[in-house]
């Protein structure tokens, strides 16, 4: 991958005044992304609260039409398991999952055509986030292209792949040029989700503070290693993001972040509770990762077990919390159920 020194070496620290920031947030918190908090785009077709999986990877089974240009692995040929949108829809229907947010899988690289086509096939049930090369000088324009021309709803940035100098380093997270991307995101109404390591969060915080109207999701509890000898310093970096009302967290991937890795992951509950107490139930999201039979291949529980994790296993979520986390929060965030 080509290295762009201007992006990696010109990180800036925004001097946004705390009071000005909070005033800006206050003016926009009730209307985030065009949705007032009184609007209810929450109902499933049967009138019940929706179940929205906010983190679903799907990939094509047709490499000629949808190739696999993995950006970090030149030797990559094809995924080890199938994970098509047809598998996803069957899984959703079987377990009462009303909607999903597709998150472009790394297998298809920066070509988001497959997830865009999936949304066109199932526009009432799916939204999609693409991947774009964060070191590309035209990243803002490419985001606009995928959103305006192909109907994507946001972008994922996988900062974790650039940690510790990998692939040119993660200086792009808060580089001067990156502010243009965030300004464009505000204009487009884009939602960002970040696959990011805890020690990278201070760089993200710079951007969140400078752009309080851009909605940002931290994936997988910031891929926290809860089995580390002392996870507390990293965990505090995640909790520090709670003071920004435009930040949400996915309570996901407990199979990989918990110490035990064994369902229902009770050793992770004390940490999840601290995130819950810091961010509140309105800014937590449900997401699982893979469709159908692919779940077992990637060591993930079945979809019904993932749903039960919030409904039956994690002990401190109230019934109202469960509805919010499993779907209502996502309905607000992405506008599920609203006419387009």
Stretches with model-predicted labels:
Residues 98, 108-199, 206, 250-254, ...:
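Active-site gating/metal-coordination segments in enzymes
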Residues 41-43:
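Boundary at the C-terminal end of the N-terminal hydrophobic targeting segment
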Residues 55-61, 220:
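Histidine-centered divalent metal-coordination motifs
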Residues 60-86, 91-95, 149-168, 214-215, ...:
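Active-site gating loops and adjacent loop-to-helix segments of metal-dependent hydrolytic enzymes
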Residues 2-8, 15-33, 45-54, 72-99, ...:
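Mid-to-C-terminal alpha-helical segments outside catalytic/metal-binding sites
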Residues 84-88, 111-114, 138-142, 201-204, ...:
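Alpha-helical scaffolding within the catalytic cores
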Residues 153, 170-286, 294, 321, ...:
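Catalytic pocket-lining loop regions of alpha/beta-barrel enzymes
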């Amino acid at each position: 991958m080509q290295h762009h020194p201007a992006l990696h070496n010109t990180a800036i620290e925004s001097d946004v005044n705390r009071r000005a920031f909070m005033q800006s947030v206050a003016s926009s918190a009730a209307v985030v992304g065009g949705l007032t908090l009184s609007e209810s785009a929450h109902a499933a077709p049967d009138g019940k609260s929706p179940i929205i999986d906010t983190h679903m990877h799907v990939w094509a089974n047709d490499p000629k039409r949808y190739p696999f240009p993995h950006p970090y692995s030149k030797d990559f040929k094809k995924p080890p398991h199938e994970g098509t949108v047809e598998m996803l829809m069957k899984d959703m229907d079987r377990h009462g999952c009303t909607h999903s947010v597709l998150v472009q899988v790394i297998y298809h690289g920066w070509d988001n055509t497959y997830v865009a086509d999936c949304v066109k096939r199932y526009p009432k049930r799916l939204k999609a986030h693409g991947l774009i090369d964060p070191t590309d000088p035209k990243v803002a324009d490419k985001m606009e292209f995928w959103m305006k021309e192909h109907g994507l709803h946001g972008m994922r940035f996988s900062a974790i792949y650039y940690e510790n100098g990998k692939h040119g380093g993660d200086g792009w997270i808060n580089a001067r040029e990156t502010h243009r991307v965030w300004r464009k995101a505000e204009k487009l109404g884009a939602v960002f989700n970040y696959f990011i390591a805890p020690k990278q969060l201070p760089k993200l915080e710079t951007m969140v503070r400078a752009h309080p109207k851009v909605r940002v999701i931290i994936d997988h509890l910031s891929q926290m290693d809860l089995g580390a000898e002392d996870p507390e310093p990293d965990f505090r970096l995640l909790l520090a993001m709670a003071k920004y009302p435009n930040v949400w967290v996915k309570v996901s991937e407990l199979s990989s972040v918990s110490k035990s890795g064994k369902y229902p992951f009770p050793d992770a509950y004390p940490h999840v509770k601290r995130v819950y107490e810091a961010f509140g139930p309105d800014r937590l999201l449900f997401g699982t990762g893979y469709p159908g039979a692919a779940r077992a291949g990637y060591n993930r529980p079945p979809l019904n077990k993932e749903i039960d994790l919030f409904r039956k296993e994690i002990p401190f979520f109230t019934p109202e919390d469960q509805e919010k986390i499993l779907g209502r929060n996502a309905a607000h965030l992405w506008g599920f159920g609203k006419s387009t």
